[in-house]
Structure formats: structure tokens, C-alpha cells
């Protein structure tokens, strides 16, 4: 199983796999960050656009967007997580790449493994795979409140 979710402060990737496949999972997922492939993202964009359209029919989502827009004016929290309709219709690959390079850095990452995994072995594999990521200076987001 593989899934992802986006919040205001995080992007989460969820996976379920047998412990015997840990090395394969680490290979695949470290490559996602070490050598990302930015190609046409139309298929995923369609999924996000469907989510956006569904959110426009959900009272709670509309209320939350309205509340955050007025509580945090000018802050990224004031914008809907899914973005604006016009941005979804005309996405810019360059903007996606810039965002990725700014925020998807080792200093902003956390890896959590749960299950029947041997810690010492897992740590060696993790350091071997993810240790190839180049350290970056993490950006500081805007303060929520002053």
C-alpha cells in the first residue's frame, strides 16, 4: 500500500510492506528524494482537482477555509491546502520544482518505521540510503502569530 497526504506543515507518505522488503522500500523512497523525476503531473493533478471539487461541496471544509483566511491573513495558513482553482487549472512545473528544492531537504524530514524491524539493521540501511541526501539549510516558515 502507498498513499500520501498534505497538510499545512507536512507532506506524509504512508506505506505498508513486509519487514523482509525494508531494503527495497528504502531504495525506492530514498531515490524519490535523491533523484526526483519531475515529469508531467497531469494524472495526479486530476486527483487533486477532484479533491478540490469535493471540498467545495463540504460545509466543514468551506468553514475551515473561511476561518483560516481571516485568522491568518497574509500567512500561508490563510490559503486552502489544495490551492486555488486557477492554480490547479494552470500549474507551473517550475514552481513545483522550486518548492521541492526549498522544502524537501533532509533537515525537514522524519522517517518513522513501525513493525517487526530489527533496529540495528534498519539504521544501517537507512543511513546507507538516506545518508546520500545533501544537507541543506532548512527554510524557516513565517511565524504564525506575532
Predicted regions span which residues?
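Charge-rich, well-structured scaffold segments of protease-associated domains
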Residues: 1-140
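Short, intrinsically disordered, charge-balanced linker/junction segments flanking boundaries
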Residues: 140-146
